[in-house]
């Protein structure tokens, strides 16, 4: 799960430290007495070699920012990392008393973390590496399974992607996570990315969120005092959907500005290239909750602009890590299209989509469109499909083309849908997740008052 993948692994450092201590103990035992040393020339040679290696390692300390080295990860295997930042771990002046913020070059940035010196294999230190060559080599070493395992839970998208120059500037500014963990309801969650909280909250090891109003605090005692005063048991706004234990609330950013801003702060901890909007007045937030006798607990949300000239029906989407891989992301996408149907409009997610965002949407479009084509015996046009599904015609065309279900005949696109081919594509698209019970949706489209 995402939260587990994003967690730090202090046991790695402990294990490495224990191994180092055992190694030191063995070397000490080997050189404990003159007689033993004299009777074992190999022991003397090993000690001299070890001493020379230690001197060589010491010359690298403290490691410079940009250094490449192998680091022991939570799988107890060594992985290539790049040192992004460093900090002193004690008041000692020893060059060994540093911690290092590292990026695992095989993995997504969300796994970046602070590690102790014991986790690093100093024999592998590289200080002068051509980044393009190194990154290409790392990419080649990574298997398709590794990439999928790390990235499959991260299909959320931000309000907009960034061009190359903006991306470099963004990564430099956000290179070190400022908040390591949050507590939200009954979950402690490891964060994935930097979020621009007010300066007084930066570098807090942990922030405590009220799961209902999303106010955040530095200390557990503050949260406990707050919870005694907070009257909310669900997100502010109107409950527009209730089916079993699932509820959806529509929150107007203009009416609930602080909640909207706090939601953006929270979301940015788990979305890399999300543009943080302080002007939340322009957005509606649809917050999905699991409900019990204690209240309605947020599991994820999507936002949409109140007025979009491009027919965008979704700007940002997030499922919180503890609730991922349960079908909630697919539910949120489906819900956005049900709102478009109620509006009598076609919709599409805000562009451009990330690769994984496109993969998630392409799966939804495939399932919806092919289910209709399976049941529809006569000819059907792309416009008719769009009217039935609220999916934009361009998205329908690109999806069917990617499945080789479109042919161009006599100046027009023709859908060619063999039942066996449809079944094969549907199987590849996977399950649709939780279904939206449209009969439980009570909602009228947003209209500006006055």
UniProtKB/Swiss-Prot annotation:
The places in or outside the cell where this protein is found are: Nucleus
| Keyword terms, alphabetized | Acetylation, Activator, Acyltransferase, Chromatin regulator, Metal-binding, Nucleus, Transcription, Transcription regulation, Transferase, Zinc, Zinc-finger
Q: Could you identify this protein by its name?
A: Putative MYST-like histone acetyltransferase 1
Top-level lineage group: Eukaryota
The residue range of the signal peptide is none
- Give all residue intervals belonging to the Tudor-knot domain: 63-122
Q: Name one Pfam family in it.
A: zf-MYST
GO BP: regulation of transcription by RNA polymerase II
The broad enzyme category this protein falls into is: transferase
Identify which residues the record assigns to the active site.
Answer: 350
Q: Cite a GO CC annotation.
A: NuA4 histone acetyltransferase complex
How is the protein modified post-translationally, according to the record? Answer: Autoacetylation at Lys-274 is required for proper function.
PROSITE patterns in the record: MYST_HAT (PS51726)
Write down which residues bear the modification named N6-acetyllysine.
274
- Native organism is Oryza sativa subsp. japonica (Rice)
Return the EC number.
2.3.1.48
Q: What is the purpose of this protein? A: Histone acetyltransferase which may be involved in transcriptional activation.
Per its record, the protein catalyses: L-lysyl-[protein] + acetyl-CoA = N(6)-acetyl-L-lysyl-[protein] + CoA + H(+)
MYST-type HAT domain residues are 174-445
User: For binding acetyl-CoA, which residues are annotated in this chain's numbering?
Assistant: 317-319, 324-330, 354
Which InterPro entries has this protein been placed in?
A: Acyl_CoA_acyltransferase, Chromo-like_dom_sf, Chromo/chromo_shadow_dom, HAT_MYST-type, MYST_HAT, Tudor-knot, WH-like_DNA-bd_sf, Zf-MYST
**Which GO molecular function annotations are given, in alphabetical order?**
chromatin binding; histone acetyltransferase activity; transcription coregulator activity; zinc ion binding
The Swiss-Prot or TrEMBL record describes its family as follows: Belongs to the MYST (SAS/MOZ) family.
Outline the residue ranges of the record's C2HC MYST-type zinc fingers. Answer: 207-232
